Amino acid sequence: WCNHSPYLSNSSKMGYGGDFNDTPNDGNFCTNGVIFSDRTYSAKAYEVKKIHQPVWVEAMGNGTYKLTNKRFHAGLDDLYGRYEIEEDGKVVFSANLEELSLNAQDSKVITIADNQINKIPGAEYFIKFRFCQKQDTEWEKAGYEVASEQFKLSDSAKPVFKAGEGSIDLIET
């Protein structure tokens, strides 16, 4: 699950395989983990976290979303949920979701009103759901995000153009 590559002597580089002049060796076999040797996340760690997240959100259309508890033996009472609406990458509205009282493997549909913001023509809008721990655990502090999902709310609104005055001359040569 984690890389097993020690630091090279007098270097900030982590070594593996033939870096220690040890032949034969297993090549990069010891650096195929999800976590780097210094216990920082690799890109694979974020992918594994996403795949194993305990809450899935599915867009159903017309402002409705299906929340599913992917846990097999526990409810979601230890989590709280929030959603944010982003306009061109900036949060313009956020709110808490109602209590996540979903038993193992259960689902429920929620509705989020689409009129909470005034949409600007030409802007792009997304909704992001976040699910975080209510309390500290042995492995992470309260507030740690265990699941998230993002959906495009709509294509960016078309800008409104006013017809200009005057004329255009086309000269073909």
Regions inferred by a protein language model and the residue ranges of each:
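Short beta-strand elements
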Residues: 136-162
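Conserved, mostly hydrophobic/aromatic
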Residues: 48, 67, 129
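Hydrophobic residues positioned within well-ordered beta-strands of beta-sheet architectures
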Residues: 63-65, 81, 110, 127, ...
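Short hydrophobic alpha-helix segments
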Residues: 7-8, 95-97, 149
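Intrinsically disordered, low-complexity Pro/Gly/Ser/Thr-rich segments with frequent PxxP/GP/PP motifs
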Residues: 89-124, 128-132, 139
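Extended substrate-binding grooves/exosites of carbohydrate-active enzymes
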Residues: 1-62, 72-77, 82-91
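Beta-strand-rich N-terminal accessory domains
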Residues: 71, 133, 157-173
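Extracellular ectodomain segments of secreted/surface proteins
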Residues: 50-60, 152, 156-159, 163-164
